[in-house]
A protein has these predicted regions:
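Cofactor-binding beta-sheet edge motifs in enzyme active sites
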Residues: 2-729
Length: 729
């Protein structure tokens, strides 16, 4: 497959595109799968070096046979930029060696999936699942257009034609013609047919989907250094912007030495924003140096100023036990109160999860250039929600969205943080103020201390068991800041529990919170799965078999659990000083289960994970190697979060500032073996980017419980916390 050096493409006006393409073009809506004429103002990023009509908004086939497929998803290392075109190319029956991939234009009405209401968002591990059916349909429609044109040219029935990779075949006359040749004369039908699902490819005939030889399109450029991230952007006349932001969210700035700062050589301007003071200078070094010289007085009336982590946990503990306090019901069925009264034994426990920072590798950045007359603008950024970023920039600049062109770039990590648009808005505000192209950069300290964290939360669980020791009553109350961010993962669709109540009691501390990889599934599945093991341990039941009973009505989940137990050799005799733990979780439609083997240094409190086994049902696997890498990555990020990561808030301000006091997992901590297996499935693809993270934390906690008889109920499991648990009476 041919590869371009950069993921972005020049935007063209509709008029220029039509003239260059030499034919008509239309858009295939990903959400409705209907042809739509591209309206004036839309700017398809299509290459114009060869004439020939665009078969659809998703693909451009040139007379020489080259095929450009347009990818609407952000590429941040998760592989969507290869996976989505693979799906389209499968139904198109394209020769993959002739395929090249470019980012699609930022046109959500055309490229927005149904999964997010038509928005171009790459979040929640739903790029592949969100586009799968629509891209198969669009690819099949493009194939139909090619075959229909050949049928008319050769005057043969369409039903007599078939395809091979990038070729239309008429077996009766032994004729064949390449897609490139067809593109040179093809015309578009007035209306595209809806291809019946049964006429799409049978999965057993897939050549590209599931093919382990299909390599990631972006990898060569990332290895040789030619891949372009937004942080690499340089444009003529560009200046640099940095911002001194409030250490406490909601505090307002007053700059006390503005005139002094403006007199410094190289300073273009200082700009007052609602949440900070921006410095624009001719070099980044100058901007950073001057930023350190700002004398800012911050207002003291911010809501977050009264918030501290430890006080919050005390507040949550009181809140979850208050019988008069009612929160938002997430799920309720049966008669919980009577079930608890009738229970043979009732268990209860409380779990805690600290704030977490996204820690994406590439610092936040964006470039915004306003036209000299202020009538239009260009934006360069890496974003998980480029349509939102485009709209946000337009709003700050006072422009209609059609007057803003956004060039998407690779992202050096996202994890949910880059689905927000604050860094693009800041760059736009500085560019508007100085009327020059501005490159805004966040330092690591900026990002960590003014971050949008995974919310702090506390979970209270109460469960009753019957005479056989099986759970039949379940009460779960979550309290913390972040509201909906805490709700995901609280429900248990694969466990059969007749009487249950799940409730969210949210508190607003005025903090900035955001989706973090796996969102609420991380803290919620930790609490749920650890609590289940505590009950099984007290009942002297095998935790694997205990879960099998809970899953008795869900064969898909059982298959995953049984698979991982077999992989790990569950029940085998372990070496002295070793223990195993097991846990189950579903994220983004993918049931997954993990087993880990640990050891414990009782003198230092350090837990060492030696082996991890993971089984996941991700439906049809589009890219096997990348799917495995994604699952491994989520497992390792999960390990990092459960052993090291914690943001502590005191009087509204983060007490950590960089990786010296916010450590993350290092190579020396990676397990000796990490085995991932995908359960064979004919289900449509489901999410894999976060599948491993929710179950690895409780698997470790459960192994610790099996080894020591003690429960770990506060993430992260630092040596200090482990020693405290071991020493507790």
């Amino acid at each position: 497959m041919s590869k371009s050096n950069t993921p972005s493409s020049p935007a063209l006006s509709r008029r220029k595109f039509l003239r260059a393409a030499g034919g008509i073009t239309f858009a295939v809506s990903a959400s409705a799968i209907l042809p739509k004429w591209i309206m004036d103002g839309a700017e398809p990023a299509l290459n114009t070096e060869d004439k020939g009509p665009a078969i659809s908004a998703w693909v451009h086939i040139r007379p020489d046979g080259r095929i450009t497929i347009y990818n609407p998803a952000a590429e941040m290392g998760q592989g969507s930029m290869t996976a989505l075109p693979t799906i389209f190319a499968e139904e198109l029956d394209a020769d993959w060696s002739k395929v090249q991939i470019e980012f699609s234009p930022i046109e959500p009405k055309i490229y927005g999936p149904g999964a997010w209401g038509g928005r171009m968002m790459t979040v929640g591990s739903r790029a592949v699942s969100g586009y799968y059916e629509s891209l198969r349909q669009a690819g099949a429609q493009a194939r139909y257009v090619l075959m229909d044109n050949v049928a008319k040219k050769w005057n043969v029935p369409l039903a007599e034609l078939s395809t091979e990779p990038s070729m239309v075949i008429h077996r009766a006359s032994k004729r064949k013609i390449s897609y490139g040749e067809v593109a040179s004369f093809a015309t578009m039908p007035e209306k595209l047919p809806q291809i019946p699902k049964e006429q799409l490819k049978d999965p057993k005939n897939f050549r590209l989907i599931g093919n382990p030889d299909i390599e990631r399109w972006d990898m060569p450029a990332k290895v040789n250094g030619s891949a372009k991230y937004a942080i690499d952007v340089r444009i003529p006349g560009m200046v640099y912007g940095v911002i001194s932001r409030s250490p406490v969210n909601g505090s307002k700035p007053s700059l006390l030495n503005a005139e002094e700062i403006r007199k410094i050589t190289g300073v273009i301007d200082v700009v007052t924003l609602n949440h900070g003071i921006g410095v624009v200078a001719d070099t980044l070094e100058k901007a950073l140096k001057v930023k350190a010289q700002l004398k800012i007085q911050w207002s003291t009336d911010a809501k977050a100023a009264s918030h501290s982590s430890e006080q919050a946990y005390a507040e949550y503990s009181t809140l979850v036990m208050d019988e008069n306090r009612k929160g938002r019901s997430l799920e309720a069925k049966g008669d919980l109160n009577n079930a608890l009264k009738d229970a043979q034994k009732v268990y209860s426990a409380t779990y805690k999860n600290d704030y977490l920072y996204h820690a994406q590798m590439e610092p936040l950045n964006a470039v915004v250039a306003l036209a000299p007359d202020g009538s239009s603008a260009e934006v360069w950024c890496g974003s998980q929600a480029p349509d939102s970023a485009k709209a946000a920039a337009a709003k700050v600049l006072g422009l209609d969205e059609s007057k803003v062109t956004l060039y998407p770039h690779f992202l050096g990590g996202g994890f949910g943080r880059r689905s927000n648009t604050d860094y693009v808005e800041e760059a736009a505000a500085l560019a508007k103020a100085v009327r020059k192209p501005v490159k805004l950069l966040w330092t690591r300290e900026d990002d960590l201390q003014y971050g949008q964290y995974r919310p702090i939360c506390l979970q209270y669980l109460e469960a009753g068991v019957d005479q056989a020791g099986n759970i039949n009553a379940w009460k779960y109350i979550i309290s913390g800041t972040g509201d909906n961010l805490l709700a995901s993962g609280a429900e248990m669709p694969f466990y059969t529990l007749p009487d249950l109540q799940i409730e969210l009691r949210a508190v607003d501390h005025g903090m900035r919170t955001k989706h973090w990889r796996a969102v609420g599934h991380g803290p919620n599945k930790y609490a749920i799965e650890a609590f289940i093991d505590e009950i099984a341990y007290d009942q002297k039941k095998d935790p694997y078999q205990y879960r099998r009973h809970l899953m008795r009505n869900h064969p898909r989940a059982l298959k995953v659990l049984d698979t991982v137990a077999e992989m790990a050799g569950w029940g085998k005799k372990l070496s002295a000083g070793r223990a195993m733990g097991i846990a189950f979780a579903e994220r983004s439609g993918s049931p997954g289960a993990g087993v880990c083997e640990i050891s414990l240094d009782r003198a230092t409190g350090k837990i060492k994970v030696h082996h991890i086994w993971a089984a996941v049902d991700g439906g049809v696997i589009v890219q096997p190697d990348n799917a495995k890498a994604q699952t491994e990555g989520s497992l390792l990020m999960g390990l990092s979060s459960i052993f090291y990561e914690s943001i502590t808030i005191k009087n509204g301000a983060a007490q950590q500032s960089n990786f010296h006091d916010y450590p993350i997992l290092r190579m020396e901590d990676v397990p000796e073996t990490l085995e991932v297996k995908f359960v064979a499935s004919n289900e449509p693809p489901s999410g894999l980017g976060e599948a491993g993270l929710p179950f690895i934390g409780p698997a470790v906690a459960n192994a610790f419980l099996a080894m020591t008889g003690r429960a770990l109920r506060h993430m992260p499991f630092t040596p200090e916390k482990v020693l405290a648990v071991l020493g507790a009476k």
